[in-house]
């Protein structure tokens, strides 16, 4: 499963079927394999331009099943072959219980090959630079490790938001508070206060 910015902690970062973040600031694998997939199941997804780029080329070979609570989002950007309007907590199990299990190990292996390409080309320099100043990605990854990928991530908007999205790890759901959509600058501090009040037992 790939995620978008607002769904980052839906699966733990190290889950074997978590293939990274989709979109212009996302990972190589989801963006490449999106062009190869024959079925795209979009759960609570708006298909905004930061994810799709040119909608005409997004998942061009795929049938689309779109699950969304807001009917206005269905077919707004990407046409849905199957539209499911409602709370995904109820509607998603109705779909998954009808799916026949198959071996997708080769498909997942394709993502892992992309991971290796991206690591060598981009991530190694961002997170483990050989020399020079501390990089933003390096700092984000160090903080994530210090909190054992178990902290609630709150970001403001800008380059640090994207670095945090790429290099912060998650073990639990509901671990990201960030401003998508309008991307409101100045969001970080009041959101962090709210996150601590809402989850006082978490860092």
Question: What positions do the PLM features span?
Answer:
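Short, well-ordered coil loops that connect the C-terminus of an alpha-helix to the N-terminus
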Residues: 60, 80, 101, 149, ...
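Conserved catalytic cysteine-centered active-site region
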Residues: 2-16, 169, 201
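Generic beta-strand/beta-sheet core signal
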Residues: 2-5, 42-44, 67-68, 154-158, ...
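Active-site diphosphate/adenylate-binding microenvironment
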Residues: 7, 115-199
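Residue-level signal for threonine
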Residues: 2-4, 27, 135
């Amino acid at each position: 499963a790939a995620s978008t910015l607002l769904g980052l902690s839906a699966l733990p970062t190290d889950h074997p079927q978590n293939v990274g973040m989709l979109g212009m600031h996302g990972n190589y694998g989801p963006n490449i394999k999106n062009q190869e997939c024959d079925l795209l199941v979009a759960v609570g997804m708006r298909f905004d331009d930061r994810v799709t780029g040119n909608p005409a080329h997004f998942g061009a070979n795929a049938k689309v099943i779109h699950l969304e609570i807001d009917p206005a989002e269905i077919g707004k950007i990407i046409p849905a072959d199957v539209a499911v309007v409602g709370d995904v907590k109820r509607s998603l199990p109705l779909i998954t219980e009808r799916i026949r299990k198959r071996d997708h190990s080769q498909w997942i292996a394709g993502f892992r090959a992309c991971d290796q390409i991206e690591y060598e080309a981009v991530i190694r320099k961002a997170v483990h630079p050989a020399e020079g100043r501390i990089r933003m990605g390096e700092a984000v990854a160090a903080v994530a490790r210090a909190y054992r990928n178990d902290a609630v991530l709150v970001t403001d908007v800008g380059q640090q938001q994207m670095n945090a999205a790429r290099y912060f790890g998650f073990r639990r759901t509901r671990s990201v508070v960030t401003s998508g959509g309008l991307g409101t600058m100045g969001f970080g501090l009041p959101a962090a206060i709210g996150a601590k009040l809402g989850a006082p037992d978490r860092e």
